[in-house]
């Protein structure tokens, strides 16, 4: 199947996701026939994609960007190739991990949300509306058979005074 990430970068929200899901199903049918396997029962989903979002320069899954500018920190073993490469070629990005300085490092990657991106200053209800939109316009149309569809993977954080409203929503 096809999973989307970077939704809060806001590029896909105005697009016709139902048509895109239809294209995914059609292409899955074509390729499945070509290689002699069954068509996928579920062809579309949304999940957080930490590493993918870093490589692509997007937000993670359906979640908002942390802020307009921020530092993203990743912990890595000092035996990993990425650590060795950055230590030699860009040492300003690498620091010893406080609790395990002997074998673990922290890579600090500056982030900048693109103009027009959704930031985490949005309300929980804005995120819920986005989850609903993507679930109904992307995930559900990509479902072929079976009682379980994929879901949009999301963490919704509610403030104390939002619980009742969220329950009614």
Could you tell me what each predicted segment is?
Residues 1-6, 37, 42-52, 98-112:
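A glycine-rich phosphate-binding loop feature that marks nucleotide/adenosyl-phosphate handling sites
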Residues 4-48:
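Internal maturation/activation junctions in enzymes
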Residues 10-12, 52, 91:
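Functionally constrained cores in energy, signaling, and assembly domains
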Residues 48, 57-169:
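Catalytic alpha/beta core of large soluble enzyme barrels
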């Amino acid at each position: 199947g096809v999973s989307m990430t970077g939704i809060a970068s806001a590029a896909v929200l105005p697009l016709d996701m139902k048509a895109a899901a239809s294209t995914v199903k059609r292409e899955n049918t074509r390729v499945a026939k070509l290689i002699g396997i069954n068509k996928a029962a579920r062809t579309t989903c949304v999940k957080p994609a930490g590493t993918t979002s870093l490589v692509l320069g997007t937000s993670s899954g359906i979640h908002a960007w942390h802020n307009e500018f921020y530092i993203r920190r990743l912990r890595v073993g000092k035996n990993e190739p990425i650590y060795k490469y950055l230590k030699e070629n860009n040492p300003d990005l690498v620091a010893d991990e406080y609790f395990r300085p002997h074998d673990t490092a922290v890579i600090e990657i500056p982030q900048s949300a693109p103009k027009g991106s959704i930031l985490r200053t949005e309300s929980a209800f804005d995120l819920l509306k986005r989850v609903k939109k993507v679930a109904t316009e992307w995930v559900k149309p990509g479902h072929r058979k079976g009682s379980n569809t994929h879901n949009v993977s999301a963490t919704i954080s509610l403030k104390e005074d939002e619980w009742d409203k969220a329950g009614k929503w």
